[in-house]
Amino acid sequence: MAHPRRFRFGVQLNQAFEGCTWTESVRELETLGYSTLFVPDHVDSGMGPLTAMAAAVTATTTLKVAPLVLDCDFRHPAIVARELATIDLLSEGRIEVGLGAGWKAVDYTQTGIPMDRPGVRVDRMIEHAHVMKALFAGEPVDFTGEHYDITG
């Protein structure tokens, strides 16, 4: 009989526990047995996900980290790829990635970024993912798309 996969639990956190620092909070999550820390990416939801994820992996040894999810409209894919690669290096492979097309109108209002119709946002997210995948392959990237152009 095949052995079933171990069931894992993740937790979403966007600020430190009351009375604790961020470092203490993520260490407590690891001690409690959580497998993954998910950090949301909304302008009004506390900490920035990439910085919070980087801090979490340097404070823990087994806890995986992931954005829940990165809104592609707010960051260029080349910058996101670089930041995620850095977190992957710091964590020795404990990063998971989620990308999103954006849905929360207040994020767009508060940043002054126009909120395009859903189809445009989804197309941009798909292109964003293609660019990141190409960059992660480790070769020079020349890409011309509808939303992004990358050279070198």
Model segments located where?
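Internal, glycine-rich beta/alpha segment that forms the wall or movable "lid"
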Residues: 2-7, 23, 76-152
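Structured beta->alpha junctions
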Residues: 41, 69-72, 76
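N-terminal beta1-alpha1-beta2 module of alpha/beta enzyme domains
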Residues: 1-64
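Alpha-helix-loop-beta-strand connector modules within alpha/beta enzyme cores
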Residues: 49-70, 124-131, 135
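Structural beta-sheet core signal
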Residues: 11, 67, 97-99
